[in-house]
Amino acid sequence: MNAKGKVIKYGNNVDTDVIIPARYLNTSDPAELASHCMEDLDEKFTQRVQKGDVMVAGKNFGCGSSREHAPISIKASGISCVIAETFARIFYRNAVNIGLPIIECSEAAKDIKDNDQVEIDFDKGLIKNLTTGKTYQGQPFPEFMQEIISADGLIQYIKNSLS
């Protein structure tokens, strides 16, 4: 499993309240959530994000409220992967459960710049900055988590397992 795209970069402690503000939690429609993704932090996010882009952030990404709406809005906006120094644990699990690829790599999260082009090999945990040529070793997903993400989330993974 791989991802490749342009970087949209944020800092530390990006919480679920700025990923998808609480005023939009009355819907579970992914397209509607995507239309408001990051708007309290980056009002131009929905205008500049392209399918396949990669979000990069610092420490504690996804902290705050335990809402699946946050990774759903990111995934539905077209982001193919989130790279961060660290993730809040509940966000990490919610991302896997809805099929949003994420990867922790402190060095990459610090070095990669906004608008860089990156490629991620999830099987190996490799992140390559195509703009600078530098390669980083992130933490690869265990095989069962890769299977969940490849199935587009836990629900589909279970459905596939039962059929």
Swiss-Prot record:
Keyword set, alphabetical order: Amino-acid biosynthesis, Branched-chain amino acid biosynthesis, Leucine biosynthesis, Lyase
GO biological process assignments: L-leucine biosynthetic process
KW Secreted (keyword) present: no
Gene3D superfamilies associated with the record: Aconitase, domain 4
Pathway terms, separated by semicolons: Amino-acid biosynthesis; L-leucine biosynthesis; L-leucine from 3-methyl-2-oxobutanoate: step 2/4
Leading EC class: lyase
Reaction catalysed by this enzyme: (2R,3S)-3-isopropylmalate = (2S)-2-isopropylmalate
Pfam families, alphabetized: Aconitase_C (PF00694)
Recorded GO MF terms: 3-isopropylmalate dehydratase activity
EC numbers, comma separated: 4.2.1.33
Tree of life domain: Bacteria
Family: Belongs to the LeuD family. LeuD type 2 subfamily.
Function according to Swiss-Prot or TrEMBL: Catalyzes the isomerization between 2-isopropylmalate and 3-isopropylmalate, via the formation of 2-isopropylmaleate.
PANTHER family: 3-ISOPROPYLMALATE DEHYDRATASE SMALL SUBUNIT 1, 3-ISOPROPYLMALATE DEHYDRATASE SMALL SUBUNIT 2-RELATED-RELATED
Assembly: Heterodimer of LeuC and LeuD.
Designated name of the protein: 3-isopropylmalate dehydratase small subunit
Lineage of source species: Bacteria, Bacillati, Bacillota, Clostridia, Eubacteriales
